[in-house]
Structures are given as structure tokens and as C-alpha cells.
Amino acid sequence: MADRFKRGMTSPVRLLVRALPTRTSRIVGALLAATASALCVIPGFNVLNYYSGLAIAVVGGLLVGLTNASDPIQPTRARLRTIILGRLAQALFLACIPLVILLLNAFRVTNCDLMAGLSFYAVGPLATILIASQWGLAARLLGQTRQRSILAFLGLWLAWIGSDVISFLTEPPIFAYNAFVGFFSGAVYDDLIRIDPPLLFFRLGNLVQLGLLLAVVSPLFVAHRAAIELSRLRTVRPLQWAVAGVAVLCVGTLTGAAGYLGYDIDRETIQAQLGGTLSNDQIVLFYDQSTITPEEAALILEDQTFRLHQLQPHGRGTGCGPT
């Protein structure tokens, strides 16, 4: 009986060791479990929804990316595709740890819409963790050493998030899309947060970016050294150049259309979409010319100018130019 019990306990342990073969990956698994457990006692985050998904995406994307950047790639005869699939499988296992904990917590806290929560988890933390694992792997391939690889991934992570923070602070939109975070809604009310086409287009763009990275790195990968060698550029076949060219074209197309697809909107994009402009010496009004006539826009501009004068002492301008 004791032997049977030991064998029963050994099987899950072996599964865990196979799924998370390195010490770093097991530590990350424990940290993700701790994060999900902490969320289980925080109101609003203790169910499977947008908010818990956002928290797990931030933590999971960073940790899994760092894991893949720090874990060495063993020199083998395996193709790069096999290594990528192995890292994806590991990332998928790690992403499932918080999911299982939050699903179990549903026995304690009622989920309003479990299917919506699963959908948010799929396009949020699950996609983020899988994508971060590949950028971490790319950092390891290019950095070669553990220290350089970690610094490369951290630099990419900080630059990507920093760019979105700057855009968030300087441009009109109050939302942001990020490969390592997912979707920051900016909305206060749950009813306004939904999975819409811009988020799906954004995730498609993430996949295309990774496709370009793979198309460039794959021909340069040397399996027996587990390294990238630029000297292999001379041996790249025309078909491989063509695949890389198509990937560049796809990335360029999606990047150029990002504003119109709705996931990278700036002031110029909004002005172009609205179409109508009216101004005086104090206010520049941009309006939707498909729903507002020029006469109505003139009345709005007049009213806003009057309100601005009410806010200013003695009706004088601020000296800061048009608002």
C-alpha cells in the first residue's frame, strides 16, 4: 500500500520536472502560483476577469521572459523549431498555473461570466506569457551569455513599456496595447471593457513580429553550438530570403495601419478620422464631420470660447496659444 502511494505521488512530481526542467522555471512557477493566490483574496481580482488577467500578464510576462533569457540552450542536433516548441510548451504550463488557481477559487467566489473571463485570460496573460517566452529565447540566442541575455530582454521590456507610457501621457487615448502587458483599458466600468477587433489585430501584429524574428534567426542558427552565426548569411537560400521579405512586408503593413486598426492611435489619427476642424485665436476644435454640421461646430466653438473666458481672470488669455 505504501509503495502504491509513493508511486502515485511520484507521477505528478515527474510531470512537474519534465514540464519545468530548470530550477529557474520552477521558481517562476512558484511565484506565479503565489501571485494568483494573493489575487484570490483581493476583491475585484479574485475572479477570472480582465483585472486579474492584467495583473498576471504583468508579472508572468516579465518572469517568463527572464526565465527564457537566463536558461541556457543546450547544444544538440535539434532544429530551432524544436527548441521553440519546447519553450512554448513550458510557457503554456506556467500560464496554466494561475488559471487553475483562479478557477478553483470560483468555488469560493462566484464568477459573473466565466466564459468572458477565460476569453480575457486567453488574449491577455496566456498570449503575453507565450510571446514573452519567445522574446526571452531570442534574447538568449542573441546575447549568448546569461548576463547579456537578461539585460537584452530587460532592455526590450522596459523600452516597449516606456514607449507606451510616454504615448499614454502625451497622446489623447487613455488606453494602451503592449506585448508584455496586454491591454490596458483605462476604463473605470467593467461594462466598457471588452475584447474588440483592435486587441485581436494587435495580437496578430505580435505574432507577425515573432514570425519576422524567426525568419531572420532561423537560417543563422547552428544547432551543435546552440548559437547564432552571422557567417551563415552567405548560405541563406533564396526561399529563406523570400520568407524574411514577406515577414518584413507584413510587419510594415500592420505597423503602418495600426492607427486605422485601432491599437496605436495618436492625435493625428484622431484628427484624420474626425475630419472636421474649426478654430479661432484661442481654441482649435476637431469634430466628427459625419455627424456634426459646420453650423453646429461653430456653435460649439462659440460656447467653448465663452466657457474658457469664464475660467480665465478678467476674460484675458493665458498666453499659451490655442487650446
Spans of features found by a protein language model:
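Membrane-embedded alpha-helical segments of integral membrane proteins
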Residues: 159-228
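Juxtamembrane "helix-exit" motif on the non-cytosolic side of transmembrane helices
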Residues: 35-46, 100-113, 162-171
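Juxtacatalytic substrate-recognition/specificity segment
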Residues: 270-323
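Helix-loop-helix units of permease transmembrane domains in multi-pass membrane transporters
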Residues: 56-96, 100
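Hydrophobic alpha-helical transmembrane segments
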Residues: 1-69
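Secretory targeting signals
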Residues: 86-146
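Central hydrophobic cores of alpha-helical transmembrane segments
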Residues: 147-161, 242-247
